[in-house]
From Swiss-Prot:
Gene: azo1
EC number: 1.7.-.-
Superkingdom of this protein's organism: Bacteria
Function: Catalyzes the reductive cleavage of azo bond in aromatic azo compounds to the corresponding amines. Requires NADPH, but not NADH, as an electron donor for its activity.
MF annotations from Gene Ontology: FMN binding; oxidoreductase activity
Family: Belongs to the azoreductase type 2 family.
Signal peptide: none
Protein name (database record): FMN-dependent NADPH-azoreductase
Gene Ontology CC: cytosol
Keywords from the UniProt entry: Flavoprotein, FMN, NADP, Oxidoreductase
Cofactor entry: FMN
Covalent S-S links between cysteines: none
Length: 188
């Protein structure tokens, strides 16, 4: 079983990244191979059908890599910071390079982090997009706050809150169950 976590934060070492790494560890306990595609480290340009933007080779390679990894994945997790009550623009740019073939009947987990007011609004917006791309957003979603994390001596963030650790377990169990049981495999 393979999964892809797409992190839509512009900040390297973000809270969304820390949550993604935590989930990758939990999925690993189920013998799931998970790759993290962090858009802060692998930028993608906005979609340009007119061809007026000259994308550098690195960005073109990032787009192709994202598309290939999404196609190979049995499930996806979309992670974003809360930007003005919605998901990030860089995640939107990345999603614009994907289509229904990348999502069709695949379970999709939704996660976000807020620095200010805790809000699940970005996840509600992503849920509509996942449905439009024929993906299946799992029922449990995770919306954390900066205060749910602590820092190691080297500054690395980690999920400290026990409640969210339990919620993460339910989230992971749902994704694994959807993939394992494949209730919609015949519709692909």
């Amino acid at each position: 079983m393979k999964g892809l976590i797409i992190i839509g934060s512009a900040q390297v070492g973000s809270h969304t990244n820390a949550l993604s790494k935590y989930l990758k560890g939990q999925l690993g306990e189920h013998d799931v191979e998970v790759e993290i595609f962090d858009l802060a480290e692998k930028p993608i340009h906005q979609l340009d059908f007119a061809g007026t933007t000259q994308a550098v080779d690195e960005i073109k390679n990032n787009v192709k890599s994202l598309q290939n990894k999404a196609m190979e994945a049995d499930f996806l997790i979309l992670g974003t910071p809360n930007y003005h009550g919605s998901f990030s623009g860089i995640l939107k740019n990345a999603l614009d390079h994907l289509n229904m073939d990348h999502f069709k009947m695949k379970p999709v987990g939704l996660i976000c982090n807020s620095g200010g007011i805790v809000s699940s609004e970005p996840l509600s917006h992503l849920r509509v997009i996942v449905r439009s791309l024929l993906g299946i957003a799992v029922p449990t979603q995770i919306a954390t706050h900066d205060s749910d994390y602590a820092k190691l001596e080297d500054g690395t963030l980690y999920l400290e809150d026990n409640e969210f650790q339990l919620r993460s377990k339910l989230f992971v169990d749902q994704i694994v169950s959807f993939v394992t049981n494949s209730p919609y495999e015949h519709l692909k």
